[in-house]
Amino acid sequence: MTSFSNAAGTSTLAAGLASALSETDEGKVLLVDVNLGPGEVHPFFKGKPAYPLAKALEQSGPIDAAADNLYLATIGSAKSGPAQLGLKRFFDLMPNLKASDFDYIIFDMPPLGPTSPTWSLSPFMDKMLLIVQSDTTNKEVVNRGYSKLIRERENVSVVFNKAQSYGPKWISGEE
C-alpha cells in the first residue's frame, strides 16, 4: 500500500486491512511498516510491540501477536536514516517472505516520490493499492505515478480516500 503524500491515510488503511483480515480466521497476517527514517517507524500498534522483519520471519521462535492472527514488523528502526538500512535487508529477506508462516503480508510503504524506495519494492508485491487523497492529489501526478507502477507490475488498484459528498444526503441515499 502506498500513496502520493503522508496524509493520504495509507497507514490507517493498511492497519485496518490487516486487522480485518486477521479477524476472518483464515490465516496469519503480518503488517510491515516500511516507512523508514527517524520518527516515521511506529514500534507499537495499539500498545503491542512491532518486531524487526527479520525476527518476524524467523522460524525459530514465536513472536507476540498484536491481536489474534495479527503480527507487526518494521523494516528499519527509529534511529535509521532514509532507506539505506532497510532496503538491503528487505531484498535479503525476500526468499523468507515466500516461505514464511504468514498467509497475508501487508506492506505500509512510503509515499511515491522521485527517490521513494516504493518504486523498487513494488515489483515484488502481489498486489499494489495506490491510495489517492481526493482533495489534494493532482490528477497528472496520479496518472504519471499509476502509469509507472503499471509498467513495473500489472496488479495495481487505486483507492480513492477522504472523498466528500457536497450534494444533499438524500441523493446519495444516506437518509
PLM-predicted stretches and their roles:
Residues 16, 20, 43:
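Active-site signature of alpha/beta-hydrolase-fold catalytic machinery across serine-
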Residues 76, 108, 134, 159-167:
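Beta-strand-loop-alpha "switch" segments that mediate conformational coupling across diverse proteins
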Residues 26-27, 125-127, 152-156:
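Short glycine-/polar-rich loops that comprise or flank the Walker A/P-loop
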Residues 31, 72, 107, 130, ...:
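Structural beta-sheet core signal
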Residues 140-175:
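Hydrophobic micro-sites
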Residues 111-114, 125-142:
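Conserved Switch II/interswitch segment of TRAFAC-class P-loop GTPases
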Residues 12-13:
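Hydrophobic positions on the alpha1 helix immediately C-terminal to the Walker A/P-loop
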Residues 2-8, 27-104, 111-124:
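P-loop/Walker-type NTP enzyme "switch/lid" segment
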